[in-house]
From Swiss-Prot:
The keyword Oxidoreductase does not apply. GO terms for biological process: animal organ development; calcium ion homeostasis; chloride ion homeostasis; growth hormone receptor signaling pathway; hyperosmotic salinity response; magnesium ion homeostasis; positive regulation of gene expression; positive regulation of growth. Disulfide bonds join 71-183, 200-208. GO terms for molecular function: growth hormone activity; growth hormone receptor binding; metal ion binding. This is Somatotropin-1. One of its GO terms (cellular component) is extracellular space. InterPro entries: 4_helix_cytokine-like_core (IPR009079), Somatotropin (IPR034975), Somatotropin/Prolactin (IPR001400), Somatotropin_CS (IPR018116). Zn(2+) binds at residues 38, 192. Pfam families: Hormone_1. PANTHER family: SOMATOTROPIN, SOMATOTROPIN,PROLACTIN. Keywords: Disulfide bond, Hormone, Metal-binding, Secreted, Signal, Zinc. Residues 1-22 form the signal peptide. It is found in: Secreted.
Length: 210
């Protein structure tokens, strides 16, 4: 009986520590989701602002090219649809999110074009990407889902953006900015989806469907 009473304080402390860790983990998820939502909205605004400067024929042509082309970050293996996203582990979603954010650290600096509003946005984006990367890394470190086995594709470095755009023609600057902004918007939407699903899983909500 004495041993039981001795164990009770230990169990209570352990329970409080576990609850504290869960609360802190949820706080970090809330911050990460909020920041990527802001980045996604910012990316959407920047793309819409740039798209609004294009002539109708120019817009249609660039949209056709983008649909046939690919983003630099497409080499990062990620879920192809909602079903695969929901089947992925929390740790896998965090790792993919980290890779996607990391892939934009350099390209985000080249989003600066003539519009002064976009200059301010681009500077803001670089800082927010860096903060979000740190936050996701903390979530990965604190994840209890086990060890993720990364395949060979995950360990490969992305091709540099300089090579990605080196073959563009005379209208390269317009196409380059269009593709950068469109890809950035697409990737921020991916990260927002992955972090939202991961956060829901960690909060033990009954329904985490997309």
């Amino acid at each position: 009986m004495g041993q039981v009473f001795l164990l009770m304080p230990v169990l209570l402390v352990s329970c409080f520590l576990s609850q504290g860790a869960a609360i802190e983990n949820q706080r970090l998820f809330n911050i990460a989701v909020s920041r990527v939502q802001h980045l996604h909205l910012l990316a959407q605004k920047m793309f819409n602002d740039f798209d609004g400067t294009l002539l109708p024929d120019e817009r249609r042509q660039l949209n056709k090219i983008f649909l046939l082309d690919f983003c630099n970050s497409d080499s990062i293996v990620s879920p192809v649809d909602k079903h695969e996203t929901q089947k992925s582990s929390v740790l896998k979603l965090l790792h993919i999110s980290f890779r996607l954010i990391e892939s934009w650290e350099y390209p985000s600096q080249t989003l600066i074009i003539s519009n002064s509003l976009m200059v301010r946005n681009a500077n803001q984006i670089s800082e927010k990407l860096s903060d979000l990367k740190v936050g996701i890394n903390l979530l990965i470190t604190g994840s209890q889902d086990g060890v993720l086995s990364l395949d060979d594709n995950d360990s490969q470095q992305l091709p540099p953006y300089g090579n990605y755009y080196q073959n563009l023609g005379g209208d390269g600057n317009v196409r380059r900015n269009y593709e950068l902004l469109a890809c950035f918007k697409k990737d921020m939407h991916k990260v927002e989806t992955y972090l939202t699903v991961a956060k829901c899983r960690k909060s033990l909500e009954a329904n985490c469907t997309l």
